[in-house]
From Swiss-Prot:
Biological function: Putative transcription factor.
Source domain of life: Eukaryota
SUPFAM superfamilies, A to Z: Homeodomain-like
Annotated PROSITE patterns: HTH_MYB (PS51294)
Region (Disordered): 80-110
GO BP terms in the entry: regulation of DNA-templated transcription
Compartments, as annotated in UniProt: Nucleus
GO molecular function, one term: DNA binding
This protein's UniProt keywords: Activator, DNA-binding, Nucleus, Transcription, Transcription regulation
Protein name: Putative Myb family transcription factor At1g14600
GO cellular component: nucleus
Length: 255
């Protein structure tokens, strides 16, 4: 069995007694903690930072390496607790502070997640709307082109129909003009022939000239009625005019 009691060096039960230092213990103020966190972040995080380097970066008078070491261990433990591991036994104020920090971190994470989701949703919806509008514009452009082509086709057909109708109308007007001109010329020739016969010749010759003129005119009328064009009308009229002139000159010589 082991020995119990006081040893020669004053150690009770083999455990070294706690000796309180006459110097007051250093208190970690918020400013000192912010300086500590800044030093840890500069060193690349809580697992890459060492107490010696943190102490050197902080450069605070009265701060020892043991203070930094204990605070770094507590800081690592608090970070582990925030990640979901069992919470170490500490004071109520520390637990309340860590709970507040946890709630703030959780709220920040949720806001970050929602912001990222909103950004992603906005990005995808923007791309989708942009692609949809581009497709609709392409469809609208295609439909507009088709409508323009159809309008041009209808307009071309309308112009051709209008041109054809206008051309046929001009041809009909020309034909009517030729008919009216031929009828007027025929009427004038009849009047001139009747007047010349009545003034220059006796009554019997006048009757004969009238009969010859009427027969020639009847033949001319038959020729004109059998023809079907303004140019044929003019040719028939010209030939009948020549016959009438020949008959008239022959009769005058005999008289």
């Amino acid at each position: 069995m082991g020995r119990c009691g006081r040893s020669n060096d004053g150690v009770i039960g083999g455990v070294r007694p706690y000796v309180r230092s006459p110097v007051p213990r250093l208190r970690w103020t918020p400013e000192l903690h912010r300086s500590f966190v800044h030093a840890v972040d500069l060193l690349g995080g809580q697992y890459k930072a060492t107490p010696k380097l943190v102490l050197k970066i902080m450069d605070v008078k009265g701060l020892t390496i043991s203070h930094v070491k204990s605070h770094l261990q507590m800081y690592r433990g608090s970070r582990i607790t925030l990640l979901g591991k069992p919470e170490e036994s500490s004071s109520p104020s520390s637990r309340r502070r860590r709970r507040q920090d946890n709630e703030e971190d959780h709220l920040h994470d949720n806001l970050s997640v929602h912001a990222r989701n909103d950004c992603l949703l906005g990005f995808h919806s923007f791309n989708f709307r942009e692609q949809t509008s581009a497709t609709d514009n392409d469809d609208d452009d295609f439909l507009n082109i088709m409508n323009m082509e159809r309008t041009k086709t209808f307009a071309g057909n309308g112009e051709s129909i209008k041109f054809q109708s206008h051309h046929s109308l001009e041809a009909e007007n020309t034909k009517n003009i030729w008919k009216n001109t031929w009828r007027e010329n025929e009427h004038e020739e009849e009047e001139e022939l009747s007047l010349s016969l009545s003034l220059n010749h006796p009554h019997n010759h006048q009757q004969r000239w009238k009969s010859n003129a009427s027969s020639s005119l009847s033949e001319t009328s038959e020729a004109v009625s059998s023809s079907s064009g303004p140019f044929i009308f003019r040719d028939c009229f010209a030939s009948s005019k020549i016959d009438l002139n020949l008959n008239l000159s022959f009769s005058l010589l005999h008289s």
